Amino acid sequence: MKSAQEDEYLEFVATRAKALYRSAYVLAAGDTHLAEDLVQETLSRVYVHWKRVAGADSPAAYAQTVLVRTFLSLRRRRSTGERPIGNLPDGAASGPDTALRLTLLDALGQLPPRDRAVLLLRYWEDRSIEETARMLRLSSSAVRSQGTRALGRVRALLGDSLSDLVPH
């Protein structure tokens, strides 16, 4: 890669890596190691195609699409691979917000990967149904039905006390 292109890529990484990590963290249901792996793999793939990516309408949207597809691909492959036996505490501050965040991440972690991706794109990233469908290679009606089903599942997992936090 030429020096100017490398500089562009490094600037892109500096501005987008945190947002990609936040999305990866939600997709990974709080698994920080998986989130870091997803971001690293995404940025590696973007780097390989940087000349084309830099000329795209939205390199950030391209990277987000790569992130989601990498997550879904990894989930398909890991179904027979390693199995985590639990998470060690981060040592992060605890409190009501932390407990709520962990409860929500646990509920998201119990969803199938594609449902989790639909919820991430629709409600975390605030993407349209059409944009979500394009990123996941689904029809718009599939995004609507999977989103509705996933929200219902999250409501059921959260129980009566927290289900009002889930969008309708």
Model-derived features: where do they sit?
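Arg/Lys-rich amphipathic alpha helix in sigma70-family domain 2
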Residues: 48-55, 65-86, 96-97
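A short pre-motif secondary-structure segment
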Residues: 118-122
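Short, charged helix-capping/linker segments at alpha-helix termini
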Residues: 1-11, 21-41, 51-57, 140
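Short, small-hydrophobic-rich alpha-helical interface motif
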Residues: 20, 24, 35-46, 66, ...
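Short, basic, alpha-helical segments at the C-terminal edge of helix-turn-helix-like DNA-binding modules
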Residues: 160-168
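Short helix-coil-helix linker/hinge
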Residues: 98, 108-116
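DNA-recognition helix of helix-turn-helix
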Residues: 68, 72, 136-160
